[in-house]
Amino acid sequence: PSMGQDNINRGIHSTLWGFAAIAVMMIIYYVTFGAVSVLALGINLLLLVAILSMLQATLTLPGLAAIALALGMAIDANVLINERIREELRNGNTPQASIHAGYDRAFDTILDSNVTTLIAGLALFMFGTGPIKGFAVVHVLGILTSMFSAVLVSRAIVNLIYGYRRKLTKLSIGQIYKA
């Protein structure tokens, strides 16, 4: 039992260190939009843990692996959005138009990747047993919270920061390289 608890503690620490590393990298690379992504990622993690707590789920190593995967998919969605906004800025669009187009145009890609992963998670749940089924439950919930946090939460935060500014001339999204 103590060996299993030790592995779970290490898994929790690994997930937290991974979160911290992602946070630092995102803020350095995307500045304000990186901070928004990190805040949305934190909300994603809190939502996922809250849902698991409401379900009275026991935290296991497969569950921790699914949480780590959910965090990876959530940050990937934010990277897609941020890069799409940068691309729109490079194309000469205004900051407001770039934000709008960035979220809209990244959505299909994010939805496709999450739906295909969700299908795999549902298959694992239907046909798996024991730890595989536990992984699948956390994985499916993580996909749903990731979609919510990456698309809706981050956009709401960006709208809070930039939405009221009508004469916005610049975005704090890191270096925008023109080819």
Which ranges hold each PLM region?
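Residue-level signature of catalytic and energy-coupling elements of molecular machines
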Residues: 3, 22, 51, 79, ...
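Interfacial segments of transmembrane alpha-helices in multi-pass membrane proteins
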Residues: 5-60, 126-130
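Alpha-helical transmembrane segments of multi-pass inner-membrane proteins
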Residues: 9, 13, 17, 35, ...
